[in-house]
């Protein structure tokens, strides 16, 4: 087979590969630097290299996992993640199913109302008063779950995916006596595994990284999510209580080590889960974003 590609095509491929390599380096280097620095005995690196200065040490990780605040933050974040993502998937799939059915007369006005909320809101103070005073969710983990129960963007993506499923399947199920709940949970959702995986990723990462709502609504330390603990460690001297028994001259280095180690501990669960759902990611986004 004759290769009909010209010199311009090869130049284009070369620059594509070059740009991708540069983007990979820019993306991976900061993460690898933090990983290496977290194992460094001095909390520093040898110049711009990824070689830990002073050798390798696991002391920072031992101190991190001995800190009860971090373990409590992990537990709270996992509770928020599991309960929040489950609620997100349930409500988003039901909402997407409703507005994807052409026989539903109010689907267009309902979609316009939801899209309006994507661009306009009452502001931070009314939101705080609503959640804290009217709903009485102050200092309650539900304040971190219920307000974001449905993402309109995710609902639109899932709705488009549902619209791509052949209507004949629904019609056949109705002839057999199936109702809307049966059609959604036994036909539509089993055929939408890719988009469900994408929704789990989107909602899960959002819950894992969320911290601002916790600053607003959570007052007791035993209810802090992990990201609040991480924020305190990074911007304050809260590492001092974790370094009992560390010599004075080594405290600065150990403080830096603890900060790096805490970042890795807070990031690791998402990094561990992502490879297992990555194969669904591109497929799900393409199915949900392009109709036809």
Feature-to-residue mapping (PLM):
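A hydrophobic, multi-pass inner-membrane permease signature
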Residues: 1-292
């Amino acid at each position: 087979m004759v290769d009909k590609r010209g010199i311009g095509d090869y130049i284009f491929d070369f620059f594509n590969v070059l740009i991708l390599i540069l983007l990979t380096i820019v993306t991976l280097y900061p993460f690898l630097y933090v990983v290496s620095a977290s194992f460094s005995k001095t909390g520093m690196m040898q110049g711009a290299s990824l070689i830990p200065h002073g050798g390798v040490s696991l002391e920072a990780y031992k101190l991190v996992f001995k800190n009860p605040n971090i373990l409590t933050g992990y537990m709270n974040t996992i509770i928020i993640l599991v309960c929040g993502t489950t609620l997100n998937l349930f409500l988003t799939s039901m909402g997407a199913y409703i507005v994807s059915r052409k026989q539903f007369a109010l689907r267009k006005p309902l979609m316009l109302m939801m899209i309006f909320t994507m661009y306009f809101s009452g502001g931070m103070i009314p939101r705080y008063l609503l959640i804290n005073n009217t709903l009485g969710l102050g200092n309650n983990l539900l304040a971190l779950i219920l307000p974001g129960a449905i993402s309109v963007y995710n609902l639109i993506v899932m709705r488009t995916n549902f619209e791509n499923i052949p209507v004949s399947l629904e019609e056949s199920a109705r002839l057999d006596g199936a109702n809307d709940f049966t059609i959604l949970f036994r036909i539509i959702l089993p055929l939408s595994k890719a988009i469900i995986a994408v929704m789990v990723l989107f909602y899960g990462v959002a819950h894992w990284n969320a911290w601002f709502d916790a600053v607003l609504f959570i007052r007791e330390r035993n209810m802090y999510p992990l990201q609040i603990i991480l924020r305190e460690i990074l911007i304050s001297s809260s590492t001092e209580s974790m370094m009992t028994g560390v010599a004075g001259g080594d405290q600065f280095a150990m403080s830096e080590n603890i900060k790096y180690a805490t970042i890795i501990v807070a990031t690791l669960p998402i990094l561990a889960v992502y490879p297992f759902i990555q194969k669904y990611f591109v497929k799900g986004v393409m199915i949900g974003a392009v109709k036809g």
